[in-house]
Every structure is written in structure tokens, then in C-alpha cells.
């Protein structure tokens, strides 16, 4: 992985990271280098939440970008998932607010969406509340297109979408990059 424009790169750890890792029957997706932290600590039998207790929001003052993480666990044709956001306390970097949302026995065709910011501002205001309910309809290409077209044009960079067959564990993935 490399930056689209290396001249704008200040802290590579905030830009270059593995956003997706698979550990057995668990798929881990994040917006930062905490992907590896979750993977490594869960591989040592720690939980998703325990792994995230070792991390905080990004150190990119004044925004202190929230770290968003998700994990999907598939077992014997059933699945559950959890999402987390680690963010500063209303822009105060001395405190980290930690929220985890867990979903057991999810309904087919339904999901949840969590994002980093709640619009524009200086500093950018962090996401608030519970993840938004979303309808997951159509095939992977239709869904990918719908999500990409609904992201803010000025702020979107990349999108990763994966459809996983719960019965077999087989999957299809799509990646969209604003800068090709």
C-alpha cells in the first residue's frame, strides 16, 4: 500500500495500514492500524473489546479522528457482529470515550453503518449515537455503488465492501478508490 500523493504524507501510520484481516472465522475491518492490534491480540485469545482497550483515537490534532472497528464472526451457518468507535471526549485528547455495539442473530438484509464524523466543522465533529440502521439490498456491485455514491464527495477516499455467504464462508470483495 502507498499514498496517492506522497508529498502530502505527514504520518504514514495514519494513512498506510491493513484495513481488513481475517482470523479463522472472524473478519476484522477498521479505519486504521488498529486492525493489526485486534488481529494479534485476538490471536492470543483476547476479546475484540480487550484489544481495543490498548488503543485510542488517532493523534491528528485538532480532529482526533475516531478509530472505527468492526468484526464479524461466522460459525456453523450463524453469525454475529460488533462495531466500535474510540473517540476523544468532545475534542479533549485527555480522555478517550469507548463505545461498542454488538449484534446477535442479525436479520438478513439489514445492517448498521458507523462513520467518523458528523459533518463539517473545525475541528471536525465526531460521530455521535448508535450506528445507523441500513438496508442491504441487491448484489455486491449494486450495494457498493449505492454506498460510494452516498459518501461525501469531498471526504471519501476508499471503500471496501465484502459479501460473505454465511453457510459456506465464501466471499466476494470490492474496493473503490477515489484516486486511481
Give the ranges of each region predicted by the language model.
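Conserved short alpha-helical segments that host acidic/polar catalytic motifs at enzyme active sites
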Residues: 1-180
